[in-house]
């Protein structure tokens, strides 16, 4: 209790220091004071330390320096200091950045180190990090520390920060099948993810309604499965752009191709892939999940996932495995015959497991790891020990905290999404419901809790497209972002509300149409451009 009171006292003291400490997400350790330094936009620059492993030419940081300079001051020129009245003697016109290990051309991974320290005092203005990914997180924090007075002068307060994420996987899922999202919308989302220190873009590319992914091996999938094969697709170049744009912001791209269910859009492009449904003894003309009884199915999956494994460089692929409806399989006489030959009886979970086990073997043969939805675990599919289980069901078959207990007790790593479905909306400040979730509040040993590697906010697309995506995402997704980054003791709702309200105004200033948290105003309101 004493440590909790001390932590809250530190939070309260920091809050009283003013706008300079309205950070989101809140750092692990911070000391700040009222002493402030002026920044002159025309003079300010980011600079590599002479001993830094990263130097000019580092794509990740070179672009980040320009990006954050524009975010802080805009791209125009500012009045010269002598035109602004009194010249301030305490100035900070250089942020020195030092990175310990090289890696400017690499991709972020689950194991990437994102720690950083930020020191702003009379002697130095220094950002120190182990990796370029930590430097990116520190640059975002630095950008939020800078504030502008009513007279238009930029300041930053004396501050010391030691920061690191609580969880290594802090994700956001976008569904681009139920409604197509333009490429620009995805890129904009990646920007705001970086502002929130989220680091995994879970791209739910395809589903029953549409197949917008352009496969170079099976182009008919897109041609016959997308809403429009000209306007509503993601080309190979689009995918490359998303991956690189994300990389430059320290964000992994986790691509999901969900099977055997959620695959109706695959059928038109690959005849024979889906299971024909029967009405009595005759085909009904409708189709169900992928047909797991045919060798052709696995030949197709081998070729398709070989392509996917080469297109998406992250070590992990998301293979879905959720919500498989057995009705069509049960109606099909060929499926029934296959099950008899395999000795499955009438247990269709065994049939599902047979398909998924075969698919997992295919994907692992390409040197990939995989993430699956919780049904794969619930249905007792034999999976590799390094499989990551994503928990998404709130109460079925058990409460999601019980599910986390069971998954980790079995020795598997887990991701939590169940309480963080942002597409579900309600009147009032529902961000609080997301914020108060404690991912480790289940019965289990310390070893079990160490297997929870993070979580994801999910934005499913039944009722969300480009017209309402941004205000529904932000700042609500920020509540999940802080829960996954900050210390467990950073949990006071009043303190969170004050900072998130300020951050929402900062998002408006940055051109993000983030919805309000309650009654109030921002100095710079959002204007449609």
Swiss-Prot record:
GO function term, MF aspect, one: beta-N-acetylhexosaminidase activity
Enzyme's top EC category: hydrolase
Major localisation: other
Activity regulation statement: Addition of GM2A stimulates the hydrolysis of sulfated glycosphingolipid SM2 and the ganglioside GM2.
Keywords, comma-separated and alphabetical: Disulfide bond, Glycoprotein, Glycosidase, Hydrolase, Lipid metabolism, Lysosome, Signal, Zymogen
Subcellular location: Lysosome
Functional summary from the UniProt entry: Hydrolyzes the non-reducing end N-acetyl-D-hexosamine and/or sulfated N-acetyl-D-hexosamine of glycoconjugates, such as the oligosaccharide moieties from proteins and neutral glycolipids, or from certain mucopolysaccharides. The isozyme S is as active as the isozyme A on the anionic bis-sulfated glycans, the chondroitin-6-sulfate trisaccharide (C6S-3), and the dermatan sulfate pentasaccharide, and the sulfated glycosphingolipid SM2. The isozyme B does not hydrolyze each of these substrates, however hydrolyzes efficiently neutral oligosaccharide.
Protein name: Beta-hexosaminidase subunit alpha
């Amino acid at each position: 209790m004493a440590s909790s009171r001390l932590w809250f006292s530190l939070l309260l003291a920091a809050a009283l220091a003013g706008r300079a400490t309205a950070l989101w997400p809140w750092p692990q350790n911070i000391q700040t004071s009222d002493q402030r330094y002026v920044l002159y936009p025309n003079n300010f620059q980011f600079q590599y330390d002479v001993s830094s492993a990263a130097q000019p030419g580092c794509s990740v940081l070179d672009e980040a320096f320009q990006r954050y300079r524009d975010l802080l001051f805009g791209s125009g020129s500012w009045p010269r200091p002598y035109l602004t009245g009194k010249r301030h003697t305490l100035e900070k016109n250089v942020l020195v950045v030092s990175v310990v290990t090289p890696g400017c051309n690499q991709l972020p991974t689950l194991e990437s180190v994102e720690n950083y320290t930020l020191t702003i005092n009379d002697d130095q203005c220094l950002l120190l990090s182990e990796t370029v990914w930590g430097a990116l997180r520190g640059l975002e924090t630095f950008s939020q520390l800078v504030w502008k007075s009513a007279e238009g002068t930029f300041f930053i307060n004396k501050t010391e920060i030691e920061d690191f994420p609580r969880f290594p996987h802090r994700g956001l899922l976008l569904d681009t099948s139920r409604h197509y999202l333009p490429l620009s919308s995805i890129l904009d989302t990646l920007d705001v993810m970086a502002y929130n220190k989220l680091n995994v873009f879970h791209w739910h590319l395809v589903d029953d309604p549409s197949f917008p992914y352009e496969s170079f091996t099976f182009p008919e999938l897109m041609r016959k499965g997308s809403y429009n094969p000209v306007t509503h697709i993601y080309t190979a170049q689009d995918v490359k752009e998303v991956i690189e744009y994300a990389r430059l912001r320290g964000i992994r791209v986790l691509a999901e191709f969900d099977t055997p269910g959620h695959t109706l859009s695959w059928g038109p492009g690959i005849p024979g892939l889906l299971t024909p449904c029967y009405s009595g003894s005759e085909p009904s003309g409708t189709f169900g999940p992928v047909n797991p009884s045919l060798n052709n199915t696995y030949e197709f999956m081998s070729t398709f996932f070989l392509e996917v494994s080469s297109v998406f460089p992250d070590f992990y692929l998301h293979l879905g495995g959720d919500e498989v409806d057995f009705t069509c399989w049960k109606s099909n006489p060929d499926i029934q015959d296959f099950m008899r030959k395999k000795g499955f009886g009438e247990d269709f979970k065994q049939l599902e497991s047979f398909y998924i086990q075969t698919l997992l073997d295919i994907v692992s043969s390409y040197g990939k790891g995989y993430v699956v939805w919780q049904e794969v675990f619930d249905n007792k599919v034999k999976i590799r020990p390094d499989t990551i289980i994503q928990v998404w069901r709130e109460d079925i078959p058990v409460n999601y905290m019980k599910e986390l207990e069971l998954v980790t007790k079995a020795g598997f790593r887990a991701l939590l999404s169940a309480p963080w479905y942002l597409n579900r909306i309600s009147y009032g400040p529902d961000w609080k419901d997301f914020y108060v979730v404690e991912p480790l509040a289940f019965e289990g040993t310390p070893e079990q809790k160490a297997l929870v590697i993070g979580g994801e906010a999910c934005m499913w697309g039944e009722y969300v497209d480009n017209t309402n995506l941004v205000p529904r995402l932000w700042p609500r997704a920020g509540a999940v972002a802080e829960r996954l980054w900050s210390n467990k003791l950073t949990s006071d709702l009043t303190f969170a509300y004050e900072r998130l309200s300020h951050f929402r105004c900062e998002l408006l200033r940055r051109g993000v149409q983030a919805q309000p948290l309650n009654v109030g105003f921002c100095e710079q309101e959002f204007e449609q451009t």
